[in-house]
Design a protein with these regions (language model features):
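Extracytoplasmic low-complexity repetitive segments enriched in small/polar residues
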Residues: 1, 5-7, 96-99, 109-110
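N-terminal capping segments
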Residues: 1-37
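Residues in intrinsically disordered, low-complexity segments of regulatory proteins
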Residues: 6, 36, 86, 95, ...
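Short capping/connector residues at structural and topological boundaries
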Residues: 19, 37, 54, 61, ...
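...with weaker cross-activation on analogous glycine-rich loops/strands in unrelated enzymes
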Residues: 41-106
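Catalytic cores and adjacent binding grooves of peptidoglycan-active enzymes
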Residues: 104, 110-113
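Low-complexity, Gly/Ser/Thr/Pro-rich intrinsically disordered linker/tail segments
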Residues: 113-128
Length: 128
């Protein structure tokens, strides 16, 4: 999450066409998650990111996991991905998210979205 926080602290503007001049990552939601996960620049798209992940249960979400509408069928345009930060409430209905949106990089509280958003964990991460 430390890498994700760096973009929140120095908010990057949003762009699907341009890359960050320092890191080389695309300045959209999937480029941001790719950067946080240390995938190769310029980063994967929301269509490709699920190939790097395993689907997990909502109750198993840990900081740095993804909440995503991605994979085949999203064509990249309708897809979106955000990083899970922490639960806001005991009922697990809202969470802190780190994400790249049209106004730039933000950390904000979001209600846990329903389908088509699903929780994912990067394959190289293990709980514990």
């Amino acid at each position: 999450m430390e890498r994700a926080r760096t973009w929140v602290e120095t908010s990057r503007r949003y762009s699907q066409e341009e890359n960050d001049p320092v890191s080389g990552y695309r300045l959209d939601c999937s480029g941001y998650v790719s950067m946080a996960w240390r995938l190769a620049p310029p980063g994967e798209t929301t269509v490709e990111l699920p190939d790097y992940c395993v689907l997990i249960d909502k109750d198993d979400l840990l900081p740095g996991d993804a909440v995503m509408n991605g994979g085949p069928g999203t064509d990249g345009n309708a897809g979106h991905v955000m990083l899970f930060g922490a639960w806001v409430d005991a009922g697990r209905t809202a969470f802190w998210t780190y994400e790249q949106i049209s106004t730039g990089t933000v950390r904000r509280i979001m209600p846990f979205p329903g389908l088509p958003y699903r929780p994912y964990r990067l394959r190289t991460v293990t709980a514990g």
